[in-house]
Regions:
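Conserved nucleotide-binding/hydrolysis micro-motifs of P-loop NTPases
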Residues: 34-35, 53-55, 77-79, 107-111
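Acidic beta-strand-to-loop metal/phosphate-binding motif
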Residues: 27-29, 67-79, 84, 104-105
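Arginine/glycine-rich "motif VI" loop of SF2 helicases in the C-terminal RecA-like domain
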Residues: 62, 90-98
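Short secondary-structure boundary/capping segments
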Residues: 43-47, 87-91, 118-122
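C-terminal or mid-to-C-terminal helical accessory/interaction module adjacent to the motor/catalytic core
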Residues: 98-167
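A structural micro-motif
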Residues: 45, 68, 99-101
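Phosphate-handling DNA/RNA-contact segment within nucleic-acid enzymes
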Residues: 1-66, 83-84
């Protein structure tokens, strides 16, 4: 990083991805360069990767300049899903009525690279129908963490998951 270049302000492949907006104005945000390369090789060219950092507010604000519907599709392993959860917690406060962020959750031991190489472009494109809005992603994660049969658990967990809304 330098004074002029900050990883948290850019994406790998953004210049190329801007040329390939699809009819839904989607862009896939993936974790790694190899994910971008594999998806691109199979014809999915509206894809970028964060540059070895957690997804930042500045990166999403940059993406929104070019795409209305970013889809965060991190690896299906535990670390990838933890990174997705951290991204959701970080990005939800900057949401407004005109912004969208979707999440696409891969199964355990899959990443975009392995998924498309194993199942192909048509399957990946169809799988994109499973994307969910950031708010639903956060609720799903929350309910995976709590014991819904234990009201005390719900109360304690709720205190840890209050998300501020911008007015």
């Amino acid at each position: 990083e330098t004074e002029f270049y900050k990883k948290g302000n850019n994406f790998y492949n953004l210049d190329s991805a801007k040329q390939y907006r699809d009819k839904n104005d989607n862009v896939y945000i993936v974790e790694g360069y190899m994910d971008v390369i594999s998806l691109h090789k199979f014809g999915i060219k509206n894809v970028v990767a964060n540059l070895g950092t957690a997804v930042t507010e500045r990166q999403i604000e940059l993406i929104w300049k070019f795409f209305k519907n970013p889809i965060i599709c991190f690896d299906g392993d535990e670390s990838g899903q933890k990174a997705a959860t951290r991204a959701a917690d970080r990005l939800f406060p900057i949401m407004n009525a005109d912004s969208n962020i979707h999440f696409l959750t891969l199964t355990e031991n899959m990443d975009p690279d392995s998924y498309i190489n194993e199942k192909g472009k048509d399957s990946f494109t169809k799988f994109t129908d499973n994307k969910i809005l950031i708010s639903n992603f956060i609720w799903n994660r929350y309910f995976q963490e709590v014991d819904v049969n234990n009201p005390q658990s719900l109360t304690l967990q709720t205190g840890n998951h209050i998300i501020p809304f911008n007015s």
